[in-house]
Swiss-Prot record:
Keywords associated with the record: Amino-acid biosynthesis, ATP-binding, Cytoplasm, Histidine biosynthesis, Hydrolase, Nucleotide-binding
HAMAP family, A to Z: HisE
InterPro entries registered for this protein in UniProt: HisE, PRib-ATP_PPHydrolase-like
Listed EC numbers: 3.6.1.31
Pfam families from the UniProt entry: PRA-PH (PF01503)
Keyword Nucleotide-binding among UniProt keywords: yes
Repeat listed as a keyword: no
Domain of life where this protein originates: Bacteria
Gene that this polypeptide is encoded by: hisE
Reactions performed catalytically: 1-(5-phospho-beta-D-ribosyl)-ATP + H2O = 1-(5-phospho-beta-D-ribosyl)-5'-AMP + diphosphate + H(+)
Primary subcellular site in the record, as a coarse category: cytoplasm
Pathway noted in the entry: Amino-acid biosynthesis; L-histidine biosynthesis; L-histidine from 5-phospho-alpha-D-ribose 1-diphosphate: step 2/9
Protein's recorded name: Phosphoribosyl-ATP pyrophosphatase
Amino acid sequence: MQQSLAVKTFEDLFAELGDRARTRPADSTTVAALDGGVHALGKKLLEEAGEVWLAAEHESNDALAEEISQLLYWTQVLMISRGLSLDDVYRKL
């Protein structure tokens, strides 16, 4: 699989989100989501998973990719909230 130069990897995103969690910028959606707690994050994950399913059924591949990217973002925010590392997840793959 070939990547373009502008691609953000799963690892890049996790590092970026971890940095936001540590530095807590005032205008950060990630910080607000973390402050909302696991229950709110779980609800958001369910919403995003539903949007992925609907996009797979009714939308273009580009729209589906966008929805999947949002699901991955929220999954990583939940991981950070619970203190999971990428290696914790990779060991289960």
